[in-house]
Regions:
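N-terminal accessory interaction module
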Residues: 1-99
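Glycine-rich anion/phosphate-binding loops
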Residues: 80-92, 119-139, 167, 211, ...
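Alpha-helix-loop-beta-strand connector modules within alpha/beta enzyme cores
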Residues: 103, 158-187, 193, 223-233
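Conserved anion-binding
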Residues: 108, 114-119, 153-156, 201, ...
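Conserved, mostly hydrophobic/aromatic
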Residues: 112, 138, 142, 146, ...
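Glycine-rich beta-to-alpha transition loops that act as phosphate-gripper elements at the mouths
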Residues: 112-113, 185-193, 209-212
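Glycine-rich, proline-tolerant flexible connector loops at the mouths of alpha/beta enzymes
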Residues: 116-120, 144-172
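Generic structural signal for well-ordered alpha-helices
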Residues: 135-136, 169-174, 195, 215-218, ...
Length: 261
């Protein structure tokens, strides 16, 4: 594990060849609806950045105004400025709709676990009557997506059979799709066979804790044009908390998702 040294000065100009540079926005107060740049074309603005630079095993963090970072890059080289502007544009650009949802505003996902061993007991559902009741409560409270899972992925959870997972989720999803509401239904599953069956009964989104690492899953979602949610974990749920190894988790996970996307 690498520790981050907080300092007032960069190791080097941003995005030069010998140093890795990463930036993240520091949002203004929620009541500050103007001033600075708009994050992802949405409702929050930012003027300042958290800049992290990595050289071998050394990490430093600098908090600085966006315009100051651009000034440093411009004074160094055209390449540094272009790369800095590109990364800031990635923060600012409006996001495309996801599963027809407008991503310029926040969305709530409700989670229903049709499992006996869920991490959060209040999300467990054991019969269809209670399932429908909870479903409508979530929708009425503003949930844009309802995520249905039949296999627990809590730390230490053991894998169940695909047959058992299907028995838990297919009929409930069929019932919920008949409710005629606007909220989308997401399937939380790592099994292609379950995904295929649930696609036939109308699931809108697939959410995979293994990040669709198998090629046959990628082929399936490409063929069906299905929206997906990619998750991150090390190893399997049963052993994911046994000595996980990160150099610096924010950067490690950022690189994981960058590669996946």
């Amino acid at each position: 594990m690498t520790f981050v040294k907080k300092t007032r000065y960069l190791l080097a100009p941003p995005y030069c060849k010998t140093i890795e540079t990463f930036i993240s926005p520091i949002p203004n107060s929620p009541t500050e609806t103007s001033g600075g740049l708009r994050l992802a074309g949405g409702w929050r603005c930012f003027k300042n950045l958290r800049v992290i630079q990595k050289k071998k095993n050394s990490l430093i963090e600098v908090l600085m105004p966006t315009q100051e970072l651009l000034r440093v890059a411009k004074n160094y080289s055209k390449d540094s400025l272009n790369k800095t502007e590109f990364q800031i544009e990635n923060l600012v650009n409006k996001r495309f709709p996801f599963a027809k949802l407008d991503m310029s505003k926040p969305h709530i996902m409700g989670v229903i676990n049709i499992t006996p061993d869920s991490f959060y007991k209040n999300s467990q559902v054991k019969n269809l009557k209670r399932l429908t009741k909870i479903f409508y409560e979530m929708v009425n409270n503003g949930a844009s997506i309802i995520d249905i899972g039949g296999e627990s992925s809590r730390p230490g959870a053991e894998k169940i059979s695909v047959v058992e997972e299907k028995q838990r989720v297919v009929r409930p999803i069929e019932q919920l799709k008949n409710c005629k509401i606007n909220s989308l239904i997401s399937l939380d599953s790592r099994n292609l066979s379950t995904m295929k069956v649930c696609h036939k009964v109308g699931v809108d989104i697939f959410n995979d804790i293994t990040a669709f690492k198998e090629k046959n899953k990628i082929n399936f979602i490409t063929k069906t044009f299905s929206p997906i949610i990619i998750m991150h974990m090390q190893k399997e749920p049963i052993n994911m908390q046994i000595n996980p190894k990160y150099n610096f988790a924010p950067i490690d996970i950022y690189k994981f998702f960058s590669k996946k996307i």
